[in-house]
Protein backbone atom coordinates (compact mmCIF):
# COMPACT_ATOMS: atom_id res chain seq x y z
CA UNK A 1 0.00 0.00 0.00
CA UNK A 2 0.89 3.64 0.28
CA UNK A 3 3.42 4.94 2.73
CA UNK A 4 2.14 6.99 5.66
CA UNK A 5 3.52 10.16 4.06
CA UNK A 6 1.66 9.37 0.80
CA UNK A 7 -1.56 8.81 2.75
CA UNK A 8 -0.98 12.05 4.64
CA UNK A 9 -0.40 14.00 1.38
CA UNK A 10 -3.59 12.55 -0.12
CA UNK A 11 -5.50 13.38 3.06
CA UNK A 12 -4.31 17.01 2.94
CA UNK A 13 -5.47 17.25 -0.69
CA UNK A 14 -8.81 15.71 0.17
CA UNK A 15 -9.21 18.02 3.18
CA UNK A 16 -8.52 21.13 1.11
CA UNK A 17 -11.35 20.17 -1.27
CA UNK A 18 -13.91 20.12 1.57
CA UNK A 19 -15.46 23.52 0.98
CA UNK A 20 -18.10 23.35 3.71
CA UNK A 21 -15.66 23.10 6.60
CA UNK A 22 -15.28 26.19 8.77
CA UNK A 23 -11.75 27.60 8.75
CA UNK A 24 -11.09 26.56 12.35
CA UNK A 25 -12.44 23.06 11.65
CA UNK A 26 -10.18 22.63 8.60
CA UNK A 27 -7.25 23.91 10.65
CA UNK A 28 -7.94 21.42 13.43
CA UNK A 29 -8.23 18.46 11.03
CA UNK A 30 -5.03 19.52 9.29
CA UNK A 31 -3.22 19.65 12.62
CA UNK A 32 -4.56 16.23 13.58
CA UNK A 33 -3.49 14.80 10.20
CA UNK A 34 -0.01 16.25 10.71
CA UNK A 35 0.40 14.44 14.03
CA UNK A 36 -1.45 11.24 13.05
CA UNK A 37 0.91 8.31 13.78
CA UNK A 38 -0.24 5.92 11.03
CA UNK A 39 -2.46 5.39 7.98
CA UNK A 40 -5.36 4.07 10.06
CA UNK A 41 -5.40 7.27 12.14
CA UNK A 42 -5.19 9.37 8.95
CA UNK A 43 -8.17 7.50 7.44
CA UNK A 44 -10.18 7.91 10.63
CA UNK A 45 -9.51 11.69 10.83
CA UNK A 46 -10.38 12.09 7.15
CA UNK A 47 -13.66 10.19 7.61
CA UNK A 48 -14.56 12.48 10.51
CA UNK A 49 -13.72 15.56 8.42
CA UNK A 50 -15.93 14.27 5.58
CA UNK A 51 -18.85 13.76 7.97
CA UNK A 52 -18.44 17.28 9.38
CA UNK A 53 -18.18 18.72 5.86
CA UNK A 54 -21.39 16.95 4.77
CA UNK A 55 -23.24 18.01 7.92
CA UNK A 56 -22.17 21.63 7.39
CA UNK A 57 -23.33 21.49 3.78
CA UNK A 58 -26.70 20.03 4.82
CA UNK A 59 -27.08 22.73 7.49
CA UNK A 60 -26.24 25.46 4.97
CA UNK A 61 -28.74 24.01 2.47
CA UNK A 62 -31.45 23.85 5.14
CA UNK A 63 -30.74 27.44 6.21
CA UNK A 64 -30.90 28.62 2.59
CA UNK A 65 -34.18 26.76 2.03
CA UNK A 66 -35.65 28.24 5.22
CA UNK A 67 -34.56 31.74 4.22
CA UNK A 68 -36.14 31.27 0.78
CA UNK A 69 -39.39 30.08 2.38
CA UNK A 70 -39.34 32.99 4.86
CA UNK A 71 -38.70 35.49 2.06
CA UNK A 72 -41.63 34.02 0.11
CA UNK A 73 -43.97 34.47 3.11
CA UNK A 74 -42.71 38.03 3.63
CA UNK A 75 -43.20 38.92 -0.05
CA UNK A 76 -46.69 37.39 -0.16
CA UNK A 77 -47.74 39.26 2.99
CA UNK A 78 -46.16 42.48 1.76
CA UNK A 79 -47.99 42.16 -1.57
CA UNK A 80 -51.31 41.69 0.26
CA UNK A 81 -50.77 44.81 2.40
CA UNK A 82 -48.99 47.10 -0.04
CA UNK A 83 -51.10 50.04 -1.16
CA UNK A 84 -54.03 49.26 1.15
CA UNK A 85 -55.75 51.05 3.99
CA UNK A 86 -56.39 49.13 7.19
CA UNK A 87 -59.57 50.27 8.91
CA UNK A 88 -59.92 49.46 12.62
CA UNK A 89 -62.45 46.68 13.16
CA UNK A 90 -62.00 45.34 16.69
CA UNK A 91 -63.49 47.59 19.40
CA UNK A 92 -60.18 49.01 20.61
CA UNK A 93 -59.20 49.90 17.01
CA UNK A 94 -62.39 51.62 15.78
CA UNK A 95 -61.48 55.12 14.61
CA UNK A 96 -57.96 54.09 13.59
CA UNK A 97 -56.95 53.99 9.94
CA UNK A 98 -53.49 52.87 8.85
CA UNK A 99 -52.49 53.25 5.21
CA UNK A 100 -49.54 51.15 4.04
CA UNK A 101 -48.48 52.81 0.80
CA UNK A 102 -46.90 50.99 -2.12
CA UNK A 103 -43.78 53.18 -1.80
CA UNK A 104 -43.30 51.73 1.72
CA UNK A 105 -44.33 54.92 3.52
CA UNK A 106 -47.45 55.01 5.69
CA UNK A 107 -50.15 57.30 7.09
CA UNK A 108 -52.19 56.85 10.22
CA UNK A 109 -55.30 58.53 11.54
CA UNK A 110 -56.08 58.01 15.20
CA UNK A 111 -59.55 59.28 16.12
CA UNK A 112 -60.01 57.73 19.53
CA UNK A 113 -58.94 58.22 23.12
CA UNK A 114 -57.70 56.41 24.97
CA UNK A 115 -55.88 54.47 22.26
CA UNK A 116 -55.33 50.83 23.26
CA UNK A 117 -54.82 49.68 19.68
CA UNK A 118 -51.68 50.35 17.66
CA UNK A 119 -49.87 53.55 18.51
CA UNK A 120 -48.36 56.16 16.20
CA UNK A 121 -45.51 54.30 14.47
CA UNK A 122 -41.98 55.71 14.50
CA UNK A 123 -39.96 56.20 11.33
CA UNK A 124 -41.36 56.86 7.88
CA UNK A 125 -41.19 53.39 6.29
CA UNK A 126 -42.88 50.04 6.81
CA UNK A 127 -41.77 46.54 5.88
CA UNK A 128 -42.67 42.91 6.40
CA UNK A 129 -40.00 40.61 7.80
CA UNK A 130 -39.99 36.95 8.75
CA UNK A 131 -37.55 35.76 11.40
CA UNK A 132 -37.01 33.12 14.06
CA UNK A 133 -37.93 35.52 16.85
CA UNK A 134 -41.53 35.25 15.67
CA UNK A 135 -41.32 31.55 14.73
CA UNK A 136 -41.47 32.15 11.00
CA UNK A 137 -44.59 34.34 11.09
CA UNK A 138 -44.63 37.55 9.04
CA UNK A 139 -44.13 40.69 11.07
CA UNK A 140 -44.99 44.32 10.30
CA UNK A 141 -42.23 46.72 11.34
CA UNK A 142 -41.78 50.45 11.07
CA UNK A 143 -38.31 51.80 10.33
CA UNK A 144 -37.53 53.38 13.70
CA UNK A 145 -39.89 51.43 15.91
CA UNK A 146 -38.92 48.68 18.33
CA UNK A 147 -42.49 47.38 18.22
CA UNK A 148 -43.25 44.53 15.83
CA UNK A 149 -46.72 43.31 14.91
CA UNK A 150 -47.27 39.69 13.91
CA UNK A 151 -49.46 39.71 10.81
CA UNK A 152 -52.24 37.23 10.13
CA UNK A 153 -54.10 37.57 6.84
CA UNK A 154 -57.45 36.12 7.88
CA UNK A 155 -58.63 35.31 4.36
CA UNK A 156 -61.93 37.15 4.85
CA UNK A 157 -60.73 40.62 3.91
CA UNK A 158 -59.41 41.30 7.39
CA UNK A 159 -55.97 41.27 8.92
CA UNK A 160 -54.91 40.83 12.53
CA UNK A 161 -51.90 42.67 13.90
CA UNK A 162 -50.69 41.10 17.11
CA UNK A 163 -48.48 42.66 19.75
CA UNK A 164 -49.68 42.94 23.34
CA UNK A 165 -53.17 42.31 21.99
CA UNK A 166 -54.73 41.15 18.74
CA UNK A 167 -55.85 44.15 16.70
CA UNK A 168 -58.21 43.44 13.82
CA UNK A 169 -58.53 45.62 10.72
CA UNK A 170 -60.54 45.50 7.52
CA UNK A 171 -58.40 45.70 4.38
CA UNK A 172 -59.70 48.30 1.95
CA UNK A 173 -58.09 49.36 -1.31
Specify the residue positions occupied by each region the protein language model found.
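Short, low-complexity, Pro/Ser/Thr/Gly-rich segments in the mature regions of secreted, periplasmic
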Residues: 163-173
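N-terminal glycine/threonine-rich, aromatic-flanked beta-hairpin/loop signature
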Residues: 91-149, 160-165
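N-terminal helix-cap/turn-to-beta initiation motif at the start of protein domains
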Residues: 69-87, 97-103
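Amphipathic alpha-helical assembly segments used for oligomerization, scaffolding, or translocation
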Residues: 1-75
